[in-house]
Every structure is written in structure tokens, then in C-alpha cells.
Amino acid sequence: MKAIIVLLMVVTSNADRICTGITSSNSPHVVKTATQGEVNVTGVIPLTTTPTKSHFANLKGTKTRGKLCPNCLNCTDLDVALGRPKCMGTIPSAKASILHEVKPVTSGCFPIMHDRTKIRQLPNLLRGYENIRLSTRNVINAERAPGGPYIIGTSGSCPNVTNGNGFFATMAWAVPKDNKTATNPLTVEVPYICTKGEDQITVWGFHSDNEAQMVKLYGDSKPQKFTSSANGVTTHYVSQIGGFPNQTEDGGLPQSGRIVVDYMVQKPGKTGTIVYQRGVLLPQKVWCASGRSKVIKGSLPLIGEADCLHEKYGGLNKSKPYYTGEHAKAIGNCPIWVKTPLKLANGTKYRPPAKLLKERGFFGAIAGFLEGGWEGMIAGWHGYTSHGAHGVAVAADLKSTQEAINKITKNLNSLSELEVKNLQRLSGAMDELHNEILELDEKVDDLRADTISSQIELAVLLSNEGIINSEDEHLLALERKLKKMLGPSAVDIGNGCFETKHKCNQTCLDRIAAGTFNAGEFSLPTFDSLNITAASLNDDGLDNHTILLYYSTAASSLAVTLMIAIFIVYMVSRDNVSCSICL
């Protein structure tokens, strides 16, 4: 007799598990963030460099001016600016200029009292212009000026090109011809004779000597008064009578007298005035200047080319957007000074390699995966891991990694824009002073640099914060992508992991990473948790009563087990029984 029995049995599977993952690294780097402090990451982009001192150089992409007149031999820049005989030449145009003379003086000619006026600033003023030329005609007729007629004085200390007595081309030494008597203050107007909207730099001054020489030359031994006025700027002087040492500061021939030299800047169309008494040095040829040339303290000669000229380090080639070290003024394509080294995160948070599944069990491996990373994600930061009989397979998701890199690139570009804006602010502050000595007060400059440094550091901290925090965003996107690809062939078990109803080796994982995965290709079996199997029994001596006895015994045992389980759950819910499960 044959009997048919329906048996209930549970079928288990050898499913694989697939998780989203992050690469591991054996060489952690540290970056600073706004809220998390220092964080170890898998890679960094250094943003700062510490330069070393080098020669000053020509600025790349622009003309750089060293000496005002390169072809004027044995002449200082002040000689050129005053028009000293034998120092007359063309000043080349330039977008950048080197302030190379620490204490500008003339190399000879008539001795000047440098410390009484701002005459030492005259070469610096001229350097601040891109185009500079000396007028071909005199601005006034000195011989017929008020208080004349005058004889134009010369000096043996100031030889001309024929080695005869001479004087500066920018001034006429007005010595009374016949009327050597004291005079009340006289006024002469200085017209604007430049063209093309140029600034006119007019040089003038006065001569003073001991009492005997003053009477001999001018008929008056008393101190003389002088005033200049242009563009609302008025300057007053009173001459000194006698008391000058024979040795001159300029190293020229001994002289009993001295001259005081000053200048005034006349804007287009504006007239200047000079009020004077005896001993005046009336203006003659004037400087016509236009455009702007950035000026920096440095030294000559200029060797080679550089991206940036820095007062302390010389010529620099820009390799990083920022630099640490000694702060000073700089011109050109320069890095910005910051107080501390800066690094931008170029990867993910540092994670040591996660432990394998077989070492910790499945749930232990999940914990290890979340704490650590996976080696083998070549050229990728985010990807997938598969755990199963084949071991551990790892594949990088290059699209997700590229998105992360694009975000870092965007942060770099934002920092670059911030750098440009700050450079423009610094450059603007310098340009505003182009008519002066072009030196900012050190304390104000340092305060500005310190403020900009703090802004940049904060921007880098916030960028690092955003890059690191975006890991969650990338992993969540990967998890959604993985879930969509796996579809009904896997069960979401949390923590970015899925239990598959099929095997998933390296080939399977590579397909997932490439976005070409198809579950049908990996022999998906029927996976019902309960299977009903029909079993046929031959008549081997078991009667129906025996079979029913076995069945009732099994059913009763199952019922008792269910009742016990329900009772335990009830007691636990009432807090009468505690239950601890250790993994």
C-alpha cells in the first residue's frame, strides 16, 4: 500500500551579501575642518608653499623697469629725475618697476639738502607711471620771470656733455642780472604743457648760502620765503642762511651753499603757482607721465623671469595659491600669504582595512565594514563589496568617485576666486597710492594681510567640512543605485547591505559597478522560504495509525513550542524577563 504524506520543511540558502563601500588607505593625511577639528583623510591637496630667497627677475608677461634710464651710465635714478647733465636719456615704458635705491641721492652736481623735502620720493613717483617722458620745451621763460631779468646760473660741479659748467635740466637757477636787491614775495604761474591727459610733474627749488654769498648773488642776506601750490596742495619753506659743512652728502665738490628741491604734480589742465624771493630755482622742463606701473622694493640686476616679485623672497614662480613664511608686499601673479599651512581634502575619511567576513561573522563584518574601508578600489573612492563563498570581491564606482572629485575641483575654483578677489583688493589699495611713494604703512598692511589670511583659512575649513560630509551623500546615492539594480533578486538588510538570492562573484560585482548588472545572468534560483514537498511511502509495515501517531506527536511538539515562545515574548514585554543576545 502506498501512502502520500505532505511534509513541511524549511529550505535555507547560501546567499551572498553586497554592500556599498569606501576605500581604505595605509597613508592617512590630516586636514582641518570647521566643526570636527582635525580629520584623517585618504588624500590631500597642499595649498601652501614656503618660498626661499632668490634673485629679483623680470615679471612674466610684462615689461619690468629696473633703472629709470638703463642707458644712462654712472647716473642714479635721482640724477635722471632731476635732469642732471650727462644723465639725459629715454625712460622705457613698464608695467612693473623695481625700487632699488634705498636712499636716493645724486651722484654729484650741486649738493642738495635731501632731508628738507620729499625730493627722494621723486624717482619713486616716476616709477609709479607706465609711460614717462621729459618735455621738449620749458614750462616758463626763466630769464623774464617776475623780479628779473635773470641770468641762468650754472656750476662747475655740474658739468655738461662738453664738460662746461651746467645745471639740472628741470630747473633754472635765477640769479638777478642787475637788480641785486631784496624783494617782496613774487608769484609765477606754472602752466600745464603736457598732452594726452598726462600728469605733469614740475620740479622747482631754491638756493641758499652763507651771508656773504647771499649778498653777492642776490643783494639780501636774510632768510627767503618760498611757497608752491598745485591741486590744493600748498607747501611753505624758509631758506637757511649759512652753517653748511664743506663736505657734501652727494660726494661732489665742496660747496658753501646748498639747494632745496621739491616737486608738484599738476593734473591735466591745472595751473600751479610758485611764490618766491631771491635764490629761486624756477621750473623748466617737466615730466609728462601716464598709465600705472606697480612698484616694489627690490635689487638689481634682474635675472631671468618670474611669476611674482616679492620684497623678501625676490622672484617667485607660483606653484600653490598660498604661501607661508614672511609676509611682505608683492606684485604679479603671486600666492597670498596665510599664517599656517593649508590642505584641502582630496578623498574620503581615513579608514583602516575592514576585517573579513569569516573572521567576525556576518554581523561583525558589517560593523567592521562601517568602521573600515576596503582595499582594491583602484582609482576609486566609493564602490561595492561582495561577501560569500568566493571570499571578498571589491569594485570601485568610478562615476561616484568622479562626482566627488568634481566637488573638490569646484571647491578649488571657489578658493581660487577668493584668492583673485583678495589680490584685487590688495592691488587696489596699492594703486590708490600711485602718486605717492607707494609704501603702505606696515601696521595697516599687516592687519589687512592677517584679516585676509583668516578669511582664507575659514574658507578652506568649510570646504573640507563639505567634502568630508558629502561621503554620506555619495554612499546613499550608491545604495539607491544598488537597490534599483538588484531589484527583487536581493533583500535589503540595512547599513547599505543587501542579501542576494544568487551568487555574486567579482564578475557580478564589476557589472554592478559598471551599471550593466542583470540578475538573470547569474542563475537566479526559486527562493521560497517554505516549500511543500510530496513524499511517497512504500508499504513497509507502517499502518495508518502509526503514521498518524508520528504526525500527531510532531504537531503537538510544534504547538507546545509555539505556546512557550508566545509566553516568553509576553513576559519580556511586561519587563518580567530580560533577554540579552550577544553577537
Curated annotation (Swiss-Prot):
The chain crosses the membrane at residues 552-572. The record marks R360, G361 as: Cleavage. A lipid is attached at C579, C582 (S-palmitoyl cysteine). InterPro entries: Capsid_hemagglutn, Hemagglutn_HA1_a/b_dom_sf, Hemagglutn_influenz_A/B, Hemagglutn_influenz_B. Glycans are attached at N40, N74, N160, N179, N246, N317, N346, N505, N531, N544. GO terms for cellular component: host cell plasma membrane; membrane; viral envelope; virion membrane. Residues 1-15 form the signal peptide. GO terms for molecular function: host cell surface receptor binding. Binds to sialic acid-containing receptors on the cell surface, bringing about the attachment of the virus particle to the cell. Plays a major role in the determination of host range restriction and virulence. Class I viral fusion protein. Responsible for penetration of the virus into the cell cytoplasm by mediating the fusion of the membrane of the endocytosed virus particle with the endosomal membrane. Low pH in endosomes induce an irreversible conformational change in HA2, releasing the fusion hydrophobic peptide. Several trimers are required to form a competent fusion pore. Major glycoprotein, comprises over 80% of the envelope proteins present in virus particle. Homotrimer of disulfide-linked HA1-HA2. HAMAP family: INFV_HEMA. This is Hemagglutinin. It comes from Influenza B virus (strain B/Oregon/5/1980). The gene is HA.
